[in-house]
């Protein structure tokens, strides 16, 4: 879930969707008009009211509303969109085995607009982008990949291949 927020924060900074001064008022929920039926509104909730949040607070306090805007767009924030979120998750190898020296390693899965159309016979909606932006929905990653990715965040960006040691 929320463990992918630092990755998407970096993507948002790189793509100039947000900068270190961008602030979003996170009052507990946002409402978005349906893309199919304009008389319907969907509510996307946060786990608490956070108030004004910049990217640092959004990562530190896991501010879902900031990441809804960062990923799917809201208000004045254009959003990364599904294609950019997919791009950065795949650049971080979220959909690939880590290469650890163990047989049968599983891969994660990064959903895309094309995958949803082909598999679920449905369009990609803003709610899908919101779910992806907080690490939910159809995204799956392995615990080992999470360790590898967070290690890269901690060590300045070097993605290390995990391995086993004797003892």
Show where each model-derived region lies.
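Beta-lactam-recognizing serine transpeptidase/beta-lactamase-like catalytic domain environment
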Residues: 1-2, 7-167
């Amino acid at each position: 879930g929320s463990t992918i927020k630092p990755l998407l924060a970096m993507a948002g900074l790189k793509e100039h969707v947000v900068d270190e001064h961008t602030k979003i008022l996170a009052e507990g929920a946002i409402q978005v008009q349906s893309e199919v039926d304009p008389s319907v509104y969907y509510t996307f909730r946060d786990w608490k009211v956070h108030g004004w949040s910049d990217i640092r607070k959004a990562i530190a306090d896991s501010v879902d509303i900031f990441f809804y805007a960062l990923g799917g767009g809201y208000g004045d924030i254009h959003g990364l969109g599904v294609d950019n979120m997919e791009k950065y998750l795949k650049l971080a190898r979220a959909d690939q085995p880590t290469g650890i020296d163990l047989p049968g390693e599983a891969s994660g899965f990064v959903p895309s607009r094309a995958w949803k159309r082909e598999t679920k016979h449905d369009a990609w909606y803003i709610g899908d982008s919101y779910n992806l932006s907080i690490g939910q929905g159809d995204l799956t990653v392995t615990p080992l990949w999470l360790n590898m990715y967070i290690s890269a965040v901690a060590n300045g960006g070097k993605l290390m291949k995990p391995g086993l040691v004797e003892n």
